[in-house]
Amino acid sequence: MAEDSTPVSATGEPSLRAPVTAADVLEWLEQAAEAARSGELDAPALIDLLGQLRQASTACANASDWALLAAREAGASLRQIAPVFGKGYVRAPAARLEKLHREVLSSEQFLELMRRRMGNR
C-alpha cells in the first residue's frame, strides 16, 4: 500500500500545495521535447509555447513573492526562509522583501496589486 505524501499543517490538516511542481514541469518538458523531435511542434507552435511559459514563469514568481510576504506576516524568520532561496544566509530573502516593500506592505496589498495588473491586460 502506497503512503500518502500529502503535506500536513501543524494542525494535521492537508496543506495547500503549489499548483505546479518541478517534477510536473520536467514531465511536460519530456513530452514537449519528444513532440518537437518528431515534428509535431513547428517553430510557430514553439514560439507560442515560449510565450505561455514566460507568462507562467511570471505568475510563479508573483506567487513566490506573495508566499514570502505571507510567511513573514505569519512569523517566519529570514533564517527560516533562507534555505528555500537556495542560500544559507538571509541576504537573498531580505533583499527580495526590501524590493517588495517599495510597492506593497503586506501580502494582501500584493494580491490586490496582482488583481489590478491582471485587470489591465
Regions inferred by a protein language model and the residue ranges of each:
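Short, Lys/Arg-enriched anionic-surface-contact patches
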Residues: 43-64
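Short, Lys/Arg-rich amphipathic alpha-helical interaction segments
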Residues: 83-84, 88-121
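Residues within the helices of the helix-turn-helix
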Residues: 79
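Short, flexible helical or helix-coil boundary motifs
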Residues: 33-36, 40, 57, 104, ...
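General nucleic-acid-binding
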Residues: 1-44
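Short amphipathic helical patch at the helix-1/turn junction of helix-turn-helix
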Residues: 71-73
